Amino acid sequence: MLKFRIRPVRHIRCYKRHAYFLRYNHTTTPAQKLQAQIEQIPLENYRNFSIVAHVDHGKSTLSDRLLEITHVIDPNARNKQVLDKLEVERERGITIKAQTCSMFYKDKRTGKNYLLHLIDTPGHVDFRGEVSRSYASCGGAILLVDASQGIQAQTVANFYLAFSLGLKLIPVINKIDLNFTDVKQVKDQIVNNFELPEEDIIGVSAKTGLNVEELLLPAIIDRIPPPTGRPDKPFRALLVDSWYDAYLGAVLLVNIVDGFVRKNDKVICAQTKEKYEVKDIGIMYPDRTSTGTLKTGQVGYLVLGMKDSKEAKIGDTIMHLSKVNETEVLPGFEEQKPMVFVGAFPADGIEFKAMDDDMSRLVLNDRSVTLERETSNALGQGWRLGFLGSLHASVFRERLEKEYGSKLIITQPTVPYLVEFTDGKKKLITNPDEFPDGATKRVNVAAFHEPFIEAVMTLPQEYLGSVIRLCDSNRGEQIDITYLNTNGQVMLKYYLPLSHLVDDFFGKLKSVSRGFASLDYEDAGYRISDVVKLQLLVNGNAIDALSRVLHKSEVERVGREWVKKFKEYVKSQLYEVVIQARANNKIIARETIKARRKDVLQKLHASDVSRRKKLLAKQKEGKKHMKTVGNIQINQEAYQAFLRR
């Protein structure tokens, strides 16, 4: 007879409790708690702000302290440059891409809860497009000045940009804990140069957190106005910045100007007319944290399934697809144009196809880099890369060299020249090899236009003479000299050709000022200029990848330097090699590498005179033929060495 053992009923009750526990866990996710916290804060308690500062004045450190005080990050952890996500940002101490972080803060004076959005912006002029979009998302900004250095060039440039956009500015002096600082002097600089009231200035130490919670956070609450958007209007968002994720595609940093948007909503971009579905949505806290919705006044991220970061146009308006006709596009959109170009070629032509795929992947994360294929008669297939400015080019070039090292030949940077023809047409030239030569100029060209910049430099007075001489030798035109204080700090303004700026002007400035000068600049438009194309010729054949466009006054000096330098890297041949520099169809410099002689008489008897003459004549004729029809072999290492500074 079979016996059955019945299990106690209590096991079933245990399973029920377990199931109930799982349901409870599901309904209280961190994202939902976060969203519930946001819902309880009214729009008038939102504060969107950024930090305006020169390099190394403590912007990233102050950001870290704010995140710690508002409990976004653990104050006990070793926090350093939390908002600087890119490796190059951490290495150079600069911000390249705009970042944001949401913070919850309870005002101890009133007990009210506030939602703060810190928008960390790039400070350099190359990324001024990102800066202006970031500022447009803010109600105010912290104007941060280093107590040991005072006002610097980048501080001035970013102050005027923020001021022109109507931002409420909070002047803050950082590093007041250092013994060798003169806080009173820096206060005078701020009052005299920016006309801000002295009583509004706050002294802090971002490193130790001194006065950050006690004075700075209350000032952000009291002085910066809340966002002015309308929650009841149709949804529209300003696209502030974007970055590329290998799994999600382009991730968009957006400011919700009006209305609200939820996950799975159908949206459209005003400039590209492309339609998308919201795949993910949330805030940066400090990394991506899904919340399911964003509403008026918030700054957060959207994932729309964009496969290419170039689909994300900075300054574009994102709207609900169903309410396009009811929604007004946000003003001020402007496509960013590259201002510095370089050529890049694989040292071994066989690797072009593999490197082409790698190059395409590299530019995915930086929509402002333009990439076009080009072919050089000397270096083979390659690419022409366009950048926003000299720092942008330098950062990307550094990345290329880290990735590929000696596998890549990168030409000298050049700027776009505007050619005005006699028939009234205009053409922008970004490749020096395409620049009209002397013969074309005499027939078809009315004028050449060169891009200029307005440079702002701050430096100690003792280096003023050296810096003025440097600017004058680079075809500079002085605008203004301002003495910032009695301690000898000077602000110098100059018009300079952009071509000189990209030719290591900043390095030369640091050299003549022993590292004490700072530089910032802005676009000053095009001017008519007497520029010509300089070509390097080897046995009469121009090396297209090495062509440069220079002012007429510099051509002879650079031409002589070129031929001497290139001669060092070209090996001797069996025939004579002539290296020349040509401009306006005239040879302005020449160097000759003598032929390497082969001993054809080695096996002859000393008395065989007729045979000797015959062999020497044959050798001479052969060399002449080789020079006429043969191509000189120049190693890729020669090009790399020549292009190296």
From Swiss-Prot:
Gene Ontology molecular-function annotations: GTP binding; GTPase activity; mitochondrial ribosome binding
GO BP: any one term: translation
Binding-site list for GTP: 53-60, 120-124, 174-177
Compartments reported by the entry: Mitochondrion inner membrane
Superkingdom assignment: Eukaryota
UniProt domain tr-type G: residue ranges: 44-228
EC number: 3.6.5.-
Further remark: This protein may be expected to contain an N-terminal transit peptide but none has been predicted.
Protein name according to UniProt: Translation factor GUF1, mitochondrial
Organism annotation: Saccharomyces cerevisiae (strain YJM789) (Baker's yeast)
Gene designation per UniProt: GUF1
